[in-house]
């Protein structure tokens, strides 16, 4: 990896707040083993508020818009709770500016970490490897809303609205992802009640005709929530609307035993945004206790989805699997001896370097 050179793949790194700089450093260790990347660090979130008063300074925004990918570590913390502009607002602004309409959230239970999953052994033993594909810019979170008074009582309303175009583009992304996995999609809706879900189902069915090799199943959201706990192995790609995906992706993440393990990608425009799903964890900041795996796997997703570097992405996953076979941060230790964030990063980077040499 080189900094600032021309003709490179340009990555903007947003270390952010809390444990962000600690876990970002581990991802940089891994990225530095690859050639052809230029890394540019920018202020974002609470640290940017401290310097500029804005969670997303214009310089950071312009750098992100001009980059090939954005890698974000963590944002927010209680220090900025009383600020007029919260750090999290910067994340919403960044996603909007990057035109990210799809959120990808994988949830995997690793063989060596089965015992820290809250699920029963007989359920975990079937295997869990799910990709939640959530529509990110439409639906009830962005619909018309308001409050009023009727017959002396206050009321409030929120409106779910989806266009055929919004549904089609997220469906096509989900089907394209399914083609590279086990060719199975479960589309989640509430078509027995909601008109927006009936349109959702209709459009997804139409898109599926262009992907005859992918098996499509529909499931009501209440049943999907139950099935995720009862038998998550039945799912591969879960396609959902914004609100349903918000809920189901968090549910799926808890099956793994630690949110520190999980990456995510927000895609749609030219530039993808990649980040672990956990927060800034101010309670362990500076104590070398953070789990960097979600951050490193976010880097792996970046290589896959922004640069079509499937081989390197797979080797990062293998490096992580090898690391947790012999070392654990405290959140996944399960009573075993734990290592710190920095040491875990060294182990993963060492594994990755070895795998790169062997896989030629």
Region spans (language model):
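Short, Lys/Arg-enriched N-terminal segments with co-localized hydrophobic residues
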Residues: 1-7, 358
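Glycine-rich phosphate/diphosphate-binding loop of Rossmann-like nucleotide-binding domains
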Residues: 11-34, 150-222, 234
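N-terminal glycine-rich phosphate/adenylate-binding segment common to multiple enzyme folds
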Residues: 50-157, 243
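Internal helix-turn-beta structural module
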Residues: 306-360
């Amino acid at each position: 990896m080189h900094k600032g050179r021309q003709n490179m793949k340009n990555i903007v790194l947003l270390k952010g707040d809390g444990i962000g700089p600690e876990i970002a450093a581990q991802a940089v260790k891994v990225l530095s083993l690859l050639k052809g990347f230029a890394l540019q660090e920018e202020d974002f979130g609470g640290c940017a508020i401290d310097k500029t008063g804005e969670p997303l300074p214009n310089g950071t925004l312009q750098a992100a818009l001009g980059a090939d990918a954005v890698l974000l570590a963590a944002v927010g913390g209680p220090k900025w709770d009383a600020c007029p502009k919260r750090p999290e607002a910067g994340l919403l602004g960044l996603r909007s500016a990057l035109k990210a309409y799809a959120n990808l959230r994988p949830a995997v239970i690793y063989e060596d970490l089965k015992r820290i999953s809250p699920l029963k052994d007989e359920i975990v033993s079937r295997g869990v490897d799910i990709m939640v594909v959530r529509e990110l810019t439409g639906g009830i979170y962005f619909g018309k809303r308001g409050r009023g008074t009727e017959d002396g009582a206050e009321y409030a309303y929120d409106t779910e609205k989806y266009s055929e175009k919004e549904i089609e583009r997220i469906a096509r992304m989900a089907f394209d992802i399914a083609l590279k996995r086990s060719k199975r999609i479960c589309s989640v809706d509430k078509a027995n009640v909601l008109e927006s879900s009936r349109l959702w189902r209709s459009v997804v069915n139409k898109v599926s005709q262009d992907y005859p090799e992918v098996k499509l199943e529909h499931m009501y959201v209440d049943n999907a929530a139950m099935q995720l706990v009862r038998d998550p192995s039945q799912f591969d790609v879960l396609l959902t609307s914004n609100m349903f995906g918000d809920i189901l992706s968090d549910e799926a993440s808890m099956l793994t035993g630690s949110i520190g393990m999980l990456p995510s990608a927000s895609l749609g425009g030219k530039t993808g945004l990649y980040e672990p799903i956990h927060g800034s964890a101010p309670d362990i900041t500076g104590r070398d206790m953070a789990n960097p795996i979600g951050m490193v796997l976010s880097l792996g997703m970046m290589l896959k989805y922004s640069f079509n570097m499937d081989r390197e992405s797979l080797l990062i996953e293998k490096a992580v699997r090898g690391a947790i076979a012999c070392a654990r941060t405290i959140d996944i230790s399960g009573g075993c001896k734990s290592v710190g964030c920095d040491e875990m990063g060294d182990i993963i980077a060492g594994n990755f370097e070895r795998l790169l040499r062997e896989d030629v």
